[in-house]
Amino acid sequence: MEALIVFIVLSVSGAFAYKCSYERLWFKVGSLFDIISTSSKKNVIPLASKMEVGSNEDVSSMGNFINKFYTEYSLPSHKVLQSLRVLFSLAMMTYTVTIEIILWQIKVAGMDKEVTFITTWVWPLTAIMLSFILILFQPFFIIISLLNKFYNDKFDIDRLIIVTCIILSTLIALLSYINIGPFQYTKNILTRLSIGGVTVMASLSGLATVSSLYYNFLVIWHKFRNTPMSDPSFRNINNSNNNSKSLLWTTDAYIEEKIQDYEHNIEQNVQILRSLEEEVGENSTFKAELMEKIAWYQLELGKLEALLQQSPQVRTFKKAFEVGFIIYCLHKLIITFLKRIPYIIYHSLKYPDDYDYENFSENAASDPLAITIANILDFSFFRFNYQHDLDSLTKQISLFLSISLFLCCLSAVNTTISYVVTLLPIKFQILALFAMQNDDTANVLPEYTNNSSYKGKKRNYSQEQKGISLIKNLVVSELTGVYVLATTLMVRSHLPFEVSQRLKELLGGKFTVPNIVIDSWFDEVYAFACVFTFICIRIAERKLSTKKVSVE
């Protein structure tokens, strides 16, 4: 009876997720890429038309690979768009059902083991859908869209499909045959993809930890020393990709002053650029550098204006969140480098053949997080007299932690996009801002019909589709699916043993990797990302100091 109720809940929630994704989310997820913007006041030079981003043609006039389908195969554009919209909605529905099945298994862990049609039919079917969506369908359309963006004038639709299939096959083969770390524990392609998600999340965690700690430390250090804003070290902070963190602690007056300085610099550089364009033998290298500098100013103006528009309450909340995040980063950094990494090195030296980490698990003296929190609450507040009360509390905390981790994995999609976009060089930031704009679906080819009501409906549909970027929507969907799978692997290490075992039985032997292997891999990638990020920051600062680059 419980399985039937769960199935009804899965069906209703899945239908709701599909409907919301189809009618609303499809039009909203592209806004996650609005990390960068140009100034609304001083957009005095058209960046996309002046800078060479991608191909030499104007990015706004690029063709659409969907139109090529129509030209070559007479396949109506609106049907292709409709299919991609259905694929996106189906993917979101599948992710929702996956999360609910995992949470249900955590909830019923510890009860009498019972095989239901959800574990024997619904979950395997869900896993198959995840495989096709994440490994074949979405990557195919992402790759073909990107190829069309850069090679629109060189590739017809047949060549686009052939090259896309070759690239996709290469990526799948690479994912199948890579044999390092936890990848050697499984041959299941979906599991390997989820391990890739764990790797990306660990890398982003290391990047965020070091960059946040480093730049916030510099800001606080210079504030205590009363360093003037014109100091070169302050200019290095402002030139960095983390200048939004430093600006969070400044006053509105300083931000307005920076806006005026940037606007003045834009006007000066534009005058120089126009004088260069009038010359016969213009210096193309100097012109390109000047264009990049103007582009940087315009992007920074967009950030400053957005910061000024925020209310004091939002600024205060962001400051409080930043302080909490700094404390967490310090804790994570200390635990990883002083406890986890030394023990991993010790284990690899003492037990070089212990590939299953049997000795590691015996010597590791840390309880799952759910048990630790339950014991703290029991000691501090509840003082339970019976073990089953403590077990019940542990299970509730396990469920809460799992829900929190899945919510965090969804927010990690936004974090990934923001860090990747802001870390790109200026030229590629302009590409992300303009070349991935809404030209993907703007040119829906018309269809002839005598039905006037259908004409009106079709016109409205075309208007709705304007403003939608296929690349953005599919990238967000792919990242979400990969992170959901990665969280499914990582969540087990925070759960009690019987809950973790129940989850392992649901996922199946082909889908699971030992908890300790995933945890150790995450720590190793995190530590490497921390060191690599710090080295890159120092190299970038030295490069800025050597070239005496100034934004004043």
From Swiss-Prot:
Annotated localization: Membrane
Spans traversing the lipid bilayer: 127-147, 160-180, 393-413, 517-537
Topology in the lipid bilayer: Multi-pass membrane protein
GO CC terms: membrane
Pfam families per UniProt: ABA_GPCR (PF12430), GPHR_N (PF12537)
Keywords assigned by UniProt, alphabetized: Membrane, Transmembrane, Transmembrane helix
Superkingdom, natural source: Eukaryota
Main location, first listed in the record: membrane
PANTHER family: G-PROTEIN COUPLED RECEPTOR 89-RELATED, GOLGI PH REGULATOR A-RELATED
The name this protein goes by in its record: Uncharacterized protein YHR078W
Source organism (scientific name): Saccharomyces cerevisiae (strain ATCC 204508 / S288c)
